[in-house]
Amino acid sequence: MTIRHQGQQYRPRMAFLQKIEALVKDMQNPETGVRMQNQRVLVTSVPHAMTGGDVLQWIIQRLWISNLEAQNLGNFIVKYGYIYPLQDPKNLVLKPDSSLYRFQTPYFWPTQQWPAEDTDYAIYLAKRNIKKKGILEEYEKENYDFLNKKINYKWDFVIMQAKEQYRTGKERNKADRYALDCQEKAYWLVHRSPPGMNNVLDYGLDRVTNPNEVKKQTVTAVRKEIMYYQQALMRSTVKSSVSLGGIVKYSEQFSSNDAIMSGCLPSNPWITDDTQFWDLNAKLVEVPTKMRVERWAFNFSELIRDPKGRQSFQYFLKKEFSGENLGFWEACEDLKYGDQSKVKEKAEEIYKLFLAPGARRWINIDGKTMDITVKGLRHPHRYVLDAAQTHIYMLMKKDSYARYLKSPIYKEMLAKAIEPQETTKRSSTLPFMRRHLRSSPSPVILRQLEEEERAREAANTVDITQPGQHLAPSPHLAVYTGTCVPPSPSSPFSPSCRSPRKPFPSPSRFIRRPSIAICPSPIRVALEGSSGLEGKGEASWSGANPGPPVTESIETSVDRSRPHSQPRAPLKARAALSLGRFLRRGCLASPVFARLSPKCPSVSHGKVQPLGDMGQQLPRLKPKKVANFFQIKMEMPTDSGPCLMDSDDPGAGESGDQTTEKEVICPWESLAEGKAG
């Protein structure tokens, strides 16, 4: 059998096909090959056909392999088109039964690489279209229409060739015509795979050179070969026993750190779905694991490869006043593997910072290495600093690394290192008890989290104008949306926030932080102060004399200015109306909510005016229709925190009580602003 390879020289990644071809040629040997005979398919007798079971048995006996390996190799032979099925052409799998197969002619083997051009495929589709009278498969119809548009300029030639091949095929006998049709179909199934079928010949771009090509011997090539062998003779040779001993020692040293051989602590996140392993082994984790710190002592490359180890080593070098060595090494790594469009700028910066005479972080290297480096910087490239980087690397490895392992910094790091306990996988057969699977944390997300943490720390400033505010939480920080009285010791909620029908307060009521003092709301203080001015007596905030409720003050002030003929509005509606108007008339924008202090009440122009006396009151406004107003009077410690206020329903009772209720205006509002609100 004569086989000519016409296009394999530039496809070295397909070199394994030659081994398959050698095996296929042995299979076609008349004496030792696969048994072949004429087989009847439909109404045609096909010559040289064989069964899939015979092919599988021959591969097992010829190569001395298992049944599974032989099945896999047989599938490869069929998928690459060396054997094609007769009964099910689309199923390119070797069936170990009586299914019929046939050897492909060497002209259609993949190694021939005669170009499977669009013109040849168009001729094949046109011939099938003529033979099947327009009945093609869907993907063949799509390819036919696409090629008709693509090579429409020579479509007449395609139709003429298809008709000629169809007429020539009719002149052959029935068996040859059937065999040729099967061969063509098998070839195009491999080279123009249908949708959903794997294209086994998709190997990427063609290579320009062929590594298996026999090169012509020239004088230059012979000199290079002689030089190579001379250098090989000069190398120091090592016994195989010494090399194997080094490999065994390395394997024993790293066996405990091999996650596949020895497992990982606390557990493998891909098996147990526990992300604690990734959290404990983050790049710059605060406290590393003990196994990670112990690995730094294996060799210097393990230390400098780990970001956390490099950070600890940098801290040690700074104590020895030699931190510029590691800084120079990191700068060289950035030059080598960083953005190559900025090589020139980075090289100049490294020279000014580390190599120039009198540089701020000048490194100590020998004169010969310095001359080589400075000469190379005239035409900078990514490897221009390799000589200086190697010199500094060996200096740190032989001098600083040994002292680092004996330093208190490494010993303290090793003592503080954590050793996580092993966790077992929790499995459950119940679907609602299974844990949801999570993917591994993305490096992009981890980087974003680190940047957010740095930004959060940078933004955490201290307000020096408020002494003591940042040291502890405010002892009476509360959210007030209604009227409340001091709660009882047995309940964290105020009893006045409850109603007889509602034993528990709603979430929009008074909410107090646990274990803190009680802060009287500014509205209650104002109402108590106003009621005291009218003769009811000033109420104090204490447990012995809690004073009249706020609702009574509102009731009294409203009843005096209202005609007795009008019915009184409900208590809740009147309280909501007063609070709603209080919040809608710009009081929320007032500086009083920034910091309520008895020494600094707010005024209408938005500025803070200090008062000399605690009991000094603002001048009373005298509007025409105002019977009461809020006067902020707070008896609390000067270092107390702010009291927050919120409205339950700002719009409650707004439309129905406009005529029956008197306006309530804040003391920092003018009458015009109150009417405009």
Swiss-Prot record:
Tissues and organs where the protein is expressed, per its UniProt entry: Expressed in the central nervous system. Isoform RGS9L is found in striatum, hypothalamus and nucleus accumbens while isoform RGS9S is expressed in retina and pineal gland.
UniProt domain DEP: residue ranges: 30-105
GO biological process, one term: response to estradiol
Domain RGS: 295-416
Keyword list, A-Z: Membrane, Sensory transduction, Signal transduction inhibitor, Vision
Compartments where found: Membrane
CDD domains registered for this protein in UniProt: DEP_RGS7-like, GGL, RGS_RGS9
Domain of life: Eukaryota
Signal peptide stretch: none
PANTHER family reported in the protein's UniProt record: LP21163P, REGULATOR OF G-PROTEIN SIGNALING 9
Annotated protein name in UniProt: Regulator of G-protein signaling 9
Organism: Rattus norvegicus
